[in-house]
């Protein structure tokens, strides 16, 4: 608050002028190195995974340090005014829109192949030789888990707004564990699948769609864990919890995307 009061003597607008930071360029180059190492490894130019693992470690490390600075600016320096929070919300909604468009392209690809399978696929869908994952097994359990997580995170959010910190923490902890269980179940499904991403168009589009959602769920689990840590350490209040609100929106969007994945990829596609 002192920082905000001192700054108001010299700054006549509510926006946050970010100090020079190395993290945007570091994250950009680390993502570039991750993409290059993945491409080279998948095409056989690199026989080991050490470059991929190193690039992934740099991406995660630089991302953690970047978000550490953002949390410090929001919690300790008072840089996130109402105008800044509004800008963050708009930016996050645009990010959600971009994610919806990415998944729309994957659904389009799936329908393109599934609704008119040619002779190379055996003129049927799933293609000849592919044993699809049964929708009444792990996918159904994952659907129930995600719907339950949406209920528990809403309970936690309302408890936080009402100032009930204990119930908010409990709901958030349950939500975090539900998402972790979802990730574990999805991993078990992948390891027990009878086909891989290399098995034609079906394997490619199936693992592209569900795998992208899986990666987002891993990110969501990390975001929920960070929100839980911040809530325990009194970083969030009933009127100022932008990070938690955006995480909740992210969770609900992924819930809806999973419902479409379950209906199309698992149920209709079988």
UniProtKB/Swiss-Prot annotation:
Q: What is its main location?
A: mitochondrion
Q: Which UniProt keywords apply?
A: Membrane, Mitochondrion, Mitochondrion inner membrane, Translocase, Transmembrane, Transmembrane helix
EC number from the UniProt entry? 7.1.1.9
Assigned GO CC terms: mitochondrial inner membrane
GO terms under biological process: mitochondrial electron transport, cytochrome c to oxygen
Q: Does the keyword Zinc-finger apply?
A: no
Q: What class of enzyme is it?
A: translocase
Q: Which residues cross the membrane?
A: 22-42, 46-66, 88-108, 128-148, 168-188, 205-225, 248-268
Q: Which InterPro entries match?
A: Cyt_c/ubiquinol_Oxase_su3, Cyt_c_oxase_su3_dom, Cyt_c_oxidase-like_su3, Cyt_c_oxidase_su3-like_sf, Cyt_c_oxidase_su3_a-hlx
**SUPFAM superfamilies linked to this entry:** Cytochrome c oxidase subunit III-like
The record lists the catalysed reaction(s) as: 4 Fe(II)-[cytochrome c] + O2 + 8 H(+)(in) = 4 Fe(III)-[cytochrome c] + 2 H2O + 4 H(+)(out)
* Bilayer topology: Multi-pass membrane protein
> What molecular function terms (GO) are annotated for this protein?
cytochrome-c oxidase activity
* Compartment(s): Mitochondrion inner membrane
**Family recorded in the similarity comment:** Belongs to the cytochrome c oxidase subunit 3 family.
**Quaternary structure (record):** Component of the cytochrome c oxidase (complex IV, CIV), a multisubunit enzyme composed of a catalytic core of 3 subunits and several supernumerary subunits. The complex exists as a monomer or a dimer and forms supercomplexes (SCs) in the inner mitochondrial membrane with ubiquinol-cytochrome c oxidoreductase (cytochrome b-c1 complex, complex III, CIII).
Q: What does this protein do?
A: Component of the cytochrome c oxidase, the last enzyme in the mitochondrial electron transport chain which drives oxidative phosphorylation. The respiratory chain contains 3 multisubunit complexes succinate dehydrogenase (complex II, CII), ubiquinol-cytochrome c oxidoreductase (cytochrome b-c1 complex, complex III, CIII) and cytochrome c oxidase (complex IV, CIV), that cooperate to transfer electrons derived from NADH and succinate to molecular oxygen, creating an electrochemical gradient over the inner membrane that drives transmembrane transport and the ATP synthase.
Q: Can you name this protein?
A: Cytochrome c oxidase subunit 3
Gene designation per UniProt = COX3
